[in-house]
Amino acid sequence: MPRRILLVIFDLDGTLTTVESLWTFLHNAFHTWDNGRVLEQKYRRGEITYKEWAETDARCWTGIPMNTLLKALNQIPYSNGAKEVFQTLRSKHVKTAIVSAGLSILADKAARELGADLAVSNELEIQDGILTGGIEVKVSVAEKAKIVKDISTRFAIPLQEIALVGDRANDLPIDDCLRIAFRPKDDAARSRANVIINDDNLSGVLPYLE
């Protein structure tokens, strides 16, 4: 018997948007990728934690005006079918959330424009319309399981009635949830998934959420 899904939790980068990494996208937009590449390599080698990586990355953007950041974000397109998916889920009274190890300024924008019930991500510090270089790290790649459980408790929806949609294994951390890999980036994501969607249209997830 198909399971009933009452809450869908989406990854953002590479899932709801076509940009695989907002961090890399912004480094390229702000011409800070030389530093960003070094920091990413340190993180991949295990020399710094995700929190340290995010904090040091954010400092690269100290002094950038908020308007410049917003102009860059407006260039990021949603994945094909994203709006349709949220409209359909809303019509069926299914709750939706966005959990991203990226940045809240894009996650919150996506939540407003797509109609998600909740967004959780990392928050850049802004003062007088300028990036201060600070950041509040709320989501790391290793903490998504805890955040999913917190959201489950918040909405009083059991894990068995939650679907997770993402492009990487860390987006699909809990076995009790339905795990949908959308445009999976590697074999680890494929092996974690109950369902694999290789099509570029996010609406391919809908038959598994009914």
For every predicted segment, state its role.
Residues 1-56:
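Active-site neighborhood of HAD-like aspartate-dependent phosphohydrolases
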Residues 25, 81, 105-109, 173, ...:
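Phosphate- and divalent-cation-binding pockets in alpha/beta enzyme and binding domains
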Residues 53-69, 125-131:
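Short, basic/glycine-rich phosphate-binding loops at helix/coil junctions
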Residues 66-98, 102-104:
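Short, acidic loop-to-helix structural element flanking the phosphoryl-transfer center
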Residues 90, 112, 190:
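Anion (oxyanion) recognition and catalysis
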Residues 96-101, 159-200:
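Acidic, Mg2+-coordinating phosphoryl-transfer loop and its flanking beta/alpha structural elements
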Residues 109-162:
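Substrate-recognition "cap/lid" segment bordering the active-site pocket of phosphatases
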Residues 121-126, 184-189, 201-205:
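Short, acidic/turn-prone active-site loops that include or flank metal/cofactor-
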